[in-house]
Every structure is written in structure tokens, then in C-alpha cells.
Amino acid sequence: MSRLFGTDGVRGLANGLLTAELAMQLAQAAAVVLGHDRTTDGKRPRAVVARDPRASGEFLAAAVEAGLSSSGIDVYDAGVLPTPAAAYLVADLDADFGVMLSASHNPAPDNGIKFFARGGQKLPDDVEDAIEAQLGKEPQRPVGADVGRIQRFSDAEDRYIVHLLGTLPKRLEGLKVVLDCAHGAASGCSPQVFKDAGAEVVVIGAEPDGLNINDGVGSTHLGPLKEAVVKHGADLGVAHDGDADRCLAVDHEGNEVDGDQIMAILALALKEAGKLKDNILVATVMSNLGLKIALRDAGITIRETGVGDRYVLEEMRDGGYNLGGEQSGHVIFSDFATTGDGVLTGLQLAAQVALTGRSLKDLSSAMTKLPQLMINVKDVDKARAATDEGVAEAVAAAELELGETGRVLLRPSGTEALVRVMVEAADMETAERICKGLAAVVKERLGAPSELAV
């Protein structure tokens, strides 16, 4: 049987893989592993439960809360909140753990369940495995006064907003900001906190109806935000995804500013302020080489991790670093948050525009993105990608040709029978030539002929 937990909790089609029964069982299992097994003061364990606004979140949250309370866990029902807000509240309320119901940037029919440990930290693999192992066991069934109670937590969003405002190095008076909330969990708090910070705010994608989350808007569909920024003459635009754990931006001319560029701006700002721990940024192997070049010239070192914000978080925790993230817009400020926070990132980015008096376009020019091409080579034996001699020779030849002007990355998919071939070079013509050549070698050496998908 395959592992139930994926890279970001349990995720799937609501009422397909992710049923109310499974949600309740996961909650009962978590009640033991994260609650009773770790609580020694004789009090009932406490958990924060939050969700994004997709329709299935209503019945799944009800199932989770039933599973927790019937297992002797007191529940703070925080309602609709961004994922990072749920993590913050676990720490702020000194709860034993938290549960977030969201499928992030996925479409409305999907949903997911992820857990946070005490302090709002993501769970390591071994704790997720313990929860999964507990699924096959009889749940705890207290009676009478020992059952858990459910408390509606009406000021959850306000607590989060106050926290965010306290992180700003400068208020945002004089800035006009367009926010695209993806019809998601930040539809209420993101516009409010930007207004409270002093910005003039234009809002799109903030009318969630349970079915329109991520539908043509948000960080995976930047077209509407680009149009709105130019139309309204805004200084910048900020886009979230459905659960607001990521942020992409748009400058005043409608140009995209991705996660790498955002990290470059913020790393340089923190270093200048003397606040970048050990002058190190943590980023994944998928970050553009231009980020490393720009920061190297400024005396900042990049610690590279595997793909996924959980690996960025692990490296940050292990090294005590305070800034990290991904090209996709997951940016983690460990001084203020335990996970990627799109609202926090947008605020910090806008604050740099206000603080420096420079446009976002000018700030983002600190990094020159190298042309990048990725080809997914399908239907191959991905397990041999790292050991095949012919593939290794082709990669070595490509790296020799590129020298310090580019790089090559071969990455087997974690879920499909394919290998991703990524090449960065000084120009797109070179990147395309080398990438297609490597992809052909991978296909020839590791699989049967078929089309290459770019």
C-alpha cells in the first residue's frame, strides 16, 4: 500500500480519496499521536482547525472536529484562514497541534488535510508515518466530561493581522497595491492588512463562493493581476494562491516578479540591515542561477535543497537561517513565521518599495534571470537517471560547454515515470539546443521512443 501522506499532507478529490470518513479517522489518529501522547499536564489537548473557502471544506472540517472532540481534544474552530495563519495560531494559542484543510493552488474539487505540531511546525515524515500507522487502531473514546469541546474562534483573523502589522519595517502610505486573492483563504485578511498598513488597495479575486478558488485568478493565473496593475496605475501587484502560503508579484509595468526575484530583493534588504543570518539564503535546486550570481556578488551564499518548501524549512531549522524559499513563491521568514506566508511576503516586498523609494521593477533588476528551458522526458526508467553512463557523459559534456554561464539539472519525478531535464544558459538558443540534446539522450538510454513534452 502506498503512503497516504504526500509532500504536503493528504490531498485528493474531496469525496473521492478524501472522504468525511477518512478525515474523521485522520483526526482521531492525530488526536493520539499529536495530542494525548504528548500532553502530560493532565489537561485535555487543544487543536486549532482552519480551512480555505472551497465548498468541501465545510463537511471535511465538521468531520475533523468530530474526530478530534470525540477523541478528547478541545478544538478552536478558526474558520476560513490562510494556512500560515493557522500555523501562527497554533503557536500563539499554545495549542498542542493544528489541522488545515486546503488543497492550496489545486482546483475546487480537490481538498487536503495537513497537520502542524506544537509551535506551528510542519510534521517530519516519521510523525506522519505514526499518524498513518494509528489509522488501523481503535481510536480513543472518552465519555462524559472527558469529551472534547468545540469553541468558535471569532477573532482568529484579527490576531493574525495584528501579528503581520508588527513585522513591517515601514508602513505603506503612498503606495497603490493591487491584490489578487485567488478567491481563496486570504480574501478577507490580505486586503484588510494592506489597508491597515496604509496602502491604497485595489482588490480582485476576493469573492469566494466555494467553487471559484484558483479559477483563472491567483498566483497560477497572473493575467488579470497584470491587467489590473496597469489599468489602475498601481505601484505593484501581489498574487496569492488558494491558501495564501505563496506570493508572486507584478511591477508597475505589468511584468512578473517571481519567487527568485522576491528572495533576491528581500535577502539584499536584510543583509543591508544586518539582519540576514550568516548572510545565507536557503533555496531549492530549481532556483534560477541568476539568483546565485546576484547574491554571490553581494556577499550572500545560497544553501541549496531538494524541491519542496519542507526541505527549505528543514535546512533553515538545522542551520538557524532566517530566509528561504522557492521560485514558485513560497518564501519563509523564520523570524516571523514557521511556514511560507504569502501575505507576509507581499507586505515585506511592498515595504521595500516604500522604504527605498525605488520601483519594484528597479528593485528586481538586482537579479538577471538566465534563460531556462525544461523538458519532461516521459515513459522512461527514472531510477537509472543517476547511474546510466551515457546520461552521465552527456551531462558532463553539457556542463563543460556551459562552464559558469549556465547549469544542467536532471530530476526524476517523484510521482510519474518521467525525468525532468532543465538547462540554463546565457541565451535561449543555447539552452534549447543543449536541453533538447540531453532529453534525446535520456529518452534513448532510459526508455522507448515517444514524444518529448516541453
UniProtKB/Swiss-Prot annotation:
Mg(2+) binds at S104, D241, D243, D245. Disulfide bonds: none annotated. Belongs to the phosphohexose mutase family. It comes from the Bacteria. CDD domains: GlmM. Gene3D superfamilies: Alpha-D-Glucose-1,6-Bisphosphate, subunit A, domain 3, Alpha-D-phosphohexomutase, C-terminal domain. The gene is glmM. Keywords: Isomerase, Magnesium, Metal-binding, Phosphoprotein. Pfam families: PGM_PMM_I, PGM_PMM_II, PGM_PMM_III, PGM_PMM_IV. GO terms for molecular function: magnesium ion binding; phosphoglucosamine mutase activity; phosphomannomutase activity. It catalyses: alpha-D-glucosamine 1-phosphate = D-glucosamine 6-phosphate. HAMAP family: GlmM_B. One of its GO terms (biological process) is carbohydrate metabolic process. SUPFAM superfamilies: Phosphoglucomutase, C-terminal domain, Phosphoglucomutase, first 3 domains. It comes from Paenarthrobacter aurescens (strain TC1). Its cofactor is Mg(2+). The keyword Phosphoprotein applies. Its EC number is 5.4.2.10. NCBIfam families: glmM (TIGR01455). The keyword Membrane does not apply. PANTHER family: PHOSPHOGLUCOMUTASE (ALPHA-D-GLUCOSE-1,6-BISPHOSPHATE-DEPENDENT), PHOSPHOHEXOSE MUTASE. This is Phosphoglucosamine mutase. It is an enzyme of class 5 (isomerase).
